[in-house]
C-alpha cells in the first residue's frame, strides 16, 4: 500500500480534529466538524482551504511564451502585464483534457503554473517531454518548497489584509485573475492572487512551506474558518466550476465539458489538440440540473454517473450534490446537443426516473442564487 503524501499543514489539520481522507494520494481534510457550516462561512464571511497538494511549477527561459502558445488551448498572448493569470486546459493530440490549470505571467522569461494534485506528475512529465522534443530549452522547476492557502468569502480580502497589513498596498487594486508579489512579510515572500474555486471573492496565497503554519494560525486568529474538501466541492459545484477527473479527463474535449470559453481559436497558433477540436467540434452539451422536489421535499440527491434521459437521447451526470445555499439537489450533466435551459429531463435514481430542470451554469456566484 502506497503511503499517503502530507502537506506542510498536516499536523495542523490533525490538531484541529479534521476528518482526513485520501484525495489523489494525499491525506487531506474533508471537514473540521460541519461541512455545511464551513460552506456557509465561505458564502457569508471567510473560510480557508489548504490547497498545498496542488503543485506550483516555474518555467524559465527565453522561449517560455512560445512554449505555452504551443502547450495551452487558451492564448497566453492575453498575458502582457506582470501578475496576470489565465485559466486554460492542457490538451492531448486527440483533444482530450490532460489537466486544467492556471498560468501566471511574471516576465518574458518566467511563467508559473499551478496544476492539480492528482495529475501533477503526469503534467510535469508531459511538460518535460514537450520541452525536450520541440527544443524550447526551458528550465522547468516543480516548487514543493511552496504551500498554498485559499482564503475565500465576502470578507476574505479584508481578513487577509488584517493578517498581513502591507499586503493591502500590493493587492487592493488587483482585478480578478491577477497576482502580486508581497515581499518582507512575517511569512516570507507571498504571491497573492485574486483567484479561487468557490464563486466568492478572495485570494489564493502562495507561501513558503516553512511559513504556512504561522500564516494559517494568524488567519484563524482573524476569524477565518478552516474549511475542508467537502465544502470546497459543494462550493465549486454551486459556482459552476469543473473538477478534473469528474467533469473532464483525457478522453473528454473541453468543448464537451462547458469549457469552450477557455479555447482560443482566433489566433494562428498550432496548439496541441487544435486540429482535433476543429475537426470534431462540440458533440454534447454541458448543463446544470436542479432536481424537482416531491411535495416540497428533496426527492433524492443527484450524483455522478446517474443516467439522464432527454428527448434527444441519454446523457450522464458528471458531478452532483445537495446545495446548502439553494437547498436543492443540483448537478452538472453531459447531454445530447439540443437540450436547452428550461427543458425538463429525467434522472435515473435507483429504480425511479425523477424530473429535473435544465439550467444555465453557474447556480450561485458571490452569494447570490442565479437560477431557479
Curated annotation (Swiss-Prot):
Keywords: Aminotransferase, Transferase
Tree of life domain: Bacteria
Database matches in InterPro entries: GCS_T, GCS_T_bac, GCST_C, GCV_T_N, GcvT/YgfZ/DmdA, GcvT/YgfZ_C, TrmE/GcvT_dom1
GO biological process: glycine decarboxylation via glycine cleavage system
GO molecular function: aminomethyltransferase activity; transaminase activity
Acyltransferase in keyword set: no
Catalytic activity, as annotated: N(6)-[(R)-S(8)-aminomethyldihydrolipoyl]-L-lysyl-[protein] + (6S)-5,6,7,8-tetrahydrofolate = N(6)-[(R)-dihydrolipoyl]-L-lysyl-[protein] + (6R)-5,10-methylene-5,6,7,8-tetrahydrofolate + NH4(+)
Enzyme class: transferase
Protein family membership: Belongs to the GcvT family.
Subunit structure comment from the entry: The glycine cleavage system is composed of four proteins: P, T, L and H.
Function summary: The glycine cleavage system catalyzes the degradation of glycine.
Protein name per Swiss-Prot or TrEMBL: Aminomethyltransferase
This protein's encoding gene: gcvT
